[in-house]
UniProtKB/Swiss-Prot annotation:
The protein's name in its UniProt record: Protein VAC14 homolog
Claim: ATP-binding is one of the keywords in the record: no
Function in brief: Scaffold protein component of the PI(3,5)P2 regulatory complex which regulates both the synthesis and turnover of phosphatidylinositol 3,5-bisphosphate (PtdIns(3,5)P2). Pentamerizes into a star-shaped structure and nucleates the assembly of the complex. The pentamer binds a single copy each of PIKFYVE and FIG4 and coordinates both PIKfyve kinase activity and FIG4 phosphatase activity, being required to maintain normal levels of phosphatidylinositol 3-phosphate (PtdIns(3)P) and phosphatidylinositol 5-phosphate (PtdIns(5)P).
Subunit and partners: Forms pentamers. Component of the PI(3,5)P2 regulatory complex/PAS complex, at least composed of PIKFYVE, FIG4 and VAC14. VAC14 nucleates the assembly of the complex and serves as a scaffold by pentamerizing into a star-shaped structure, which can bind a single copy each of PIKFYVE and FIG4 and coordinates their activities. Interacts with NOS1.
Impact reported for L156R: In ingls; loss of interaction with Pikfyve but not with Fig4
Gene name as annotated: Vac14
Disruption phenotype: Mice die perinatally and exhibit profound degeneration in certain regions of the central and peripheral nervous systems. Selected regions in the brain are affected, especially the medulla, the pons and the midbrain and increased cell death occurs in these areas. Affected neurons contain large vacuoles.
Chain positions found as Phosphothreonine: T11, T499
Native source species: Mus musculus (Mouse)
Modified residues (Phosphoserine): S517, S743
Length: 782
């Protein structure tokens, strides 16, 4: 510094003392400056005051010499003290050089800068608020200062500034938010602590409504919640808790839609605390905002569904996710199935689209670990809540179905998630069937594939969805409509439904036996497609048929019309080219028909063949049952067509008797001893009126080798009474009863010819296989 330079009105002694390396001498100079400025204030000499401040700023505080800078800082503080309440007129000139020194490399100088600014702010109090942003900016940097003395000094200044903000009603929150939004993404632990402490202060001030600006800082708060420091995480939890209290207290003013995607992002993080907190917020948002959250359903489901499969280690997250899932599901109503009305330009601009997102700010969290989240929840929508309230809330089924399809296709997804997905699909088919049927062709393959799931509960839910698809009135048309969007089109072969016999299937003459369809007993166009696809699945996956076939068919009989299921499957099997599969499938269906409690009503319908409907069903079943000779006989036993059963058994002499054949005869004998054929065994008492029943049973006996089944049937037939011994005097006087005859409306001769034709086809196929050296599979499929 040039000693010859004129620093008036500062005296040479003051200048010399300000440049001294000793603090005490600089302090003496500061007292002189304070006295000098007080005189200028008394004289109202603003020009000289400005000149003193400018000199201290330019020639000292911003000097290259460190001791001069220290002198300038203490001199500026002295000016502020001397100015008192008038310091507000000169705050810009007083503050700026001090803040510049915050960046000084010398830690002692940074400390003196804190001290100087503390004195300036202490005098000015509320007058510093117009300069709050620059003060906050400087303090946020010092909060992370490595020197403990500097940090201690900045904390004193920080507390003073917080007191001023708390007691003032003139805080400019609007201009502060951009700075807060920027600084909240700091990764420094101390800077984060500083930010959180300030947010906590602002939230506590009644006159400051920080809730309006929560969408701009919420993402940053969740970032801080993942800090390694336990204390910072705890502070952040408190802040988020305070915000949530305010949201619950006044939900009408909350911009839920602007924060929805932020929560979606953080619900997918790997940090347990962040995920649980975000999920709790999501739960409250869904319950408080209601249908405002519907446009974000796809993103919410992407975040929530995987959590439902968590184990007990993440039980809390799982429970909250389950509440979110249930609450969101309840928001979907039948009104969402109404045709979409053309939107005005204003509505198009204000309606949120969850798949459109703004570029992510620096420091924003990643989308999370989920395999299906690449298209959802990757950004943050920003729009005003007022417009959102006016815009109609639309359910975006395209995105929801895509998420559900994705999760159901992922074999690594847990059982509870798969069940939740199927519950969602079922719910959507119930509430919005018209729109959902646009997606049925893309969903059908994966729903069929899910039948192979290892969990019975998953298969049950899957069958409920398939049954609803097959029975919903919305599926009556062959052309369910184009998808909502091009993204969901999946390559699949379109099924060609045979026209013959279909009319009766789609409009059944009787609805008896229907127990489970929540929509209607009438089967729609998808019912027949479902039956075709199900049989194709059984044909290609024989293990599925063996392990789950009876279970699946029995459940479908509960959910749908059992008569229609058997009628349609029999009709399809009649055209089956794989005769071995047809025989196996007929055997499976026959076992279900004869033994399942679910088919009690259908069995009763077939017992008497008194109605045209039952006769039509018998003929349809019979033609397919001909693929398996023994099942054909059992069907005749069930329907009490004993004469025709006897005629069939007579034809067995012309068939190729194999081990499999004899095994099935053995099983039929065992079945005759079961409760299902109690009526048949009782009819053996009426020998006179049931001669063909006895003949048929003797025919089976003659087919069997000397085995346990032979002994069983032989003992049963030995119990048949002598008809002459049963005659009483009244019986002899009475006119002879006519035995139960075959139904005159059924052409049994034609049925017998059909049986011979089908069995001839089976014989030819077996001979072809034998000629190729293939051995018959002797395994009996139960």
């Amino acid at each position: 510094m040039n000693p010859e330079k004129d620093f008036a009105p500062l005296t040479p002694n003051i200048v010399r003392a300000l440049n001294d390396k000793l603090y005490e001498k600089r302090k003496v100079a500061a007292l002189e400056i304070e006295k000098l400025v007080r005189d200028f204030v008394a004289q109202n000499n603003t020009m000289q005051i400005k000149h003193v401040i400018q000199t201290l700023s330019q020639e000292f505080a911003l000097s290259q010499h460190p001791h001069s800078r220290k002198g300038g800082l203490i001199g500026l503080a002295a000016c502020s003290i001397a100015l008192g309440k008038d310091s507000g007129l000169y705050l810009k000139e007083l503050i700026e050089p001090v803040l510049t020194c915050f960046n000084d490399a010398d830690s002692r100088l940074r400390y003196y800068a804190c001290e100087a600014l503390y004195n300036i702010v202490k005098v000015a109090r509320g007058a510093v608020l117009p300069h709050f942003n620059v003060l906050f900016d400087g303090l946020s940097k010092l909060a992370a200062d490595p020197d403990p003395n500097v940090k201690s000094g900045s904390e004193l200044l920080d507390r003073l500034l917080k007191d001023i903000v708390t007691e003032s009603s003139k805080f400019d929150l609007v201009s502060f938010i951009p700075l807060l939004r920027e600084r909240i993404y700091s990764n420094n632990q101390y800077a984060r602590q500083f930010i959180i402490s300030w947010i906590l202060v602002l939230v506590s001030v009644p006159d400051i409504n920080l809730l309006d600006y929560l969408p701009e800082i919420l993402d940053g708060l969740f970032q801080i919640l993942g800090d390694n420091g336990k204390e910072i995480r705890k502070m952040c939890e408190v802040v988020l808790g305070e915000f949530l209290k305010e949201i619950k207290k006044n939900p009408s003013s909350v911009k839920f839609a602007e924060m929805a995607n932020i929560l979606v992002i953080h619900c997918q993080t790997t940090d347990d605390l962040i995920q649980l907190t975000a999920m709790c917020w999501m739960r409250e948002f869904i319950q408080l905002a209601g249908r405002v959250m519907l446009p974000y359903s796809s993103g919410i489901l992407t975040a929530v569904l995987p959590c439902l499969a968590y184990d007990d280690r993440k039980k809390s997250i799982k429970e909250v996710a389950n509440v979110c899932n249930q609450s969101l599901m309840k928001l979907v109503t039948p009104e969402d199935d109404e045709p979409d009305e053309p939107k005005s330009v204003a509505q198009k601009q204000t309606e949120p689209n969850p798949e459109d997102s703004l570029p992510k700010q620096e420091g924003t969290a990643s989308g999370g670990p989920g395999s299906c989240d690449s298209s959802f929840g990757s950004g943050i929508n920003v729009f005003t809540s007022a417009n959102t309230d006016r815009a109609p809330v639309t359910l975006h089924l395209d995105g929801i179905v895509q998420v559900l399809n994705c999760h159901l296709s992922d074999t690594t997804i847990g059982m509870m998630t798969r069940i939740a997905v199927l519950k969602w699909l079922y719910h959507l088919y119930i509430k919005t069937p018209r729109k959902m049927f646009r997606h049925t062709d893309s969903l059908f393959p994966i729903l069929l594939q899910t039948l192979s799931d290892e969990s019975d509960e998953v298969v049950l839910k899957d069958l409920e969805v398939l049954a609803e698809i097959a029975s919903s009135p919305a599926g009556q048309t062959d052309d369910p409509g184009a998808p909502d969007g091009p993204d969901l089109r999946v390559n699949h072969s379109e099924l060609q439904v045979p026209t013959s016999g279909r009319a009766n299937l789609l409009n059944p003459p009787s609805t008896k036996g229907l127990e489970g369809s929540p929509s209607t007993p009438t089967m729609n166009s998808y019912f027949y497609k479902f039956m075709i696809n199900l049989l194709q699945t059984f044909s290609s996956e024989r293990k599925l048929l063996e392990a789950r076939g009876p279970f699946i068919i029995r459940q479908l009989c509960l959910l749908l019309n059992a008569e229609n299921i058997f009628h349609s499957m029999a009709d399809i099997l009649l055209r089956e080219e794989d005769l071995k599969f047809a025989s196996t499938m007929v055997h499976t269906l026959n076992t279900i028909l004869l033994t399942s409690t679910e088919l009690f009503q259908l069995r009763n319908q077939l017992k008497d063949l008194q109605t045209p409907e039952s006769q039509n069903l018998f003929c349809c079943l019979y033609r397919s049952w001909c693929h398996n000779p023994v099942t054909t006989v059992s069907l005749c036993f069930l329907t009490q067509n004993y004469r025709h059963a006897y005629d069939l058994i007579q034809k067995f002499g012309d068939l190729e008797v194999t081990v499999d054949f004899l095994t099935e005869v053995d099983k039929l004998v065992q079945l005759i001893e079961c409760p299902i054929f109690t009526y048949l065994r009782l009819q053996l008492l009426d020998v006179k009126n049931n001669p063909y029943l006895i003949k048929a049973l003797y025919g089976l006996l003659m087919l069997l080798p000397q085995s346990s089944a032979f002994q069983l049937l032989s003992h049963r037939l030995q119990c048949v009474p002598n008809p002459e011994l049963l005659q009483t005097e009244d019986c002899l006087k009475a006119a002879p009863k006519s035995q139960k005859g075959d139904s005159p409306s059924i052409d049994y001769t034609e049925l017998l010819q059909h049986f011979e034709k089908v069995q001839k086809q089976h014989l030819e196929v077996r001979h072809q296989r034998s000629g190729r050296g293939d051995h018959l599979d002797r395994r009996v499929i139960l």
